[in-house]
């Protein structure tokens, strides 16, 4: 009798569950890498993989994949969506991060041509690193967010939402540390914020107000007093 008590729970369809990762980095814009200019343009970049199989073979997409229900020996897999996101990111790009943050669930009926698939989207910020395609990804590459290829599935929508989420977080959460080197100037940090907010020259953040806010919040501190004396407009933090 007890075995049949919850039998009804298996009468409902079981959609597949996947994770997708939006991984942002910050580096010299591709067009300026070979330039001899002293002040090269920096760009917010996103990590994409080239799909090695159908559907959308050869198209670019966000790194991600299916939540495991079984391990390699056929036993039930103890994997939550965060572990799945970390595993897929590592397998498909070689990027190994400590954590990712969920920001939205996508469940539109026809978002995947194979079957009903619900994906849990995650966001990560990393210092720019070398990447390599692996597992079912034919390639992995960083792209300037303003110069993207056409993306598979609904991944453009996911990326747009992630960028909006990042722009919201920047107003209440310090994010520069994940994207900047260990030491940086206040000017470089301001440039990062202007880049994320897509501010042009007419709408960029006020330098003095930005400096005051960062110091008041206590999230940065001078790395070298001599550097401060040497050039106050470029204090190292």
Tell what function each PLM region has.
Residues 123-124, 131-170, 179-192, 210-218:
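NUDIX/MutT-family hydrolases
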Residues 216-228:
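A short, conserved structural fragment
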Residues 106-118, 130:
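Acidic pyrophosphate-coordinating catalytic loop
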Residues 228-237:
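C-terminal engagement modules used by replication, chromatin/transcription, nuclear envelope/ESCRT
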Residues 6-62, 82:
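N-terminal strand-loop-strand
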Residues 1, 32-34, 40-41, 49, ...:
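Core subunits and conserved enzymes of cellular information-processing
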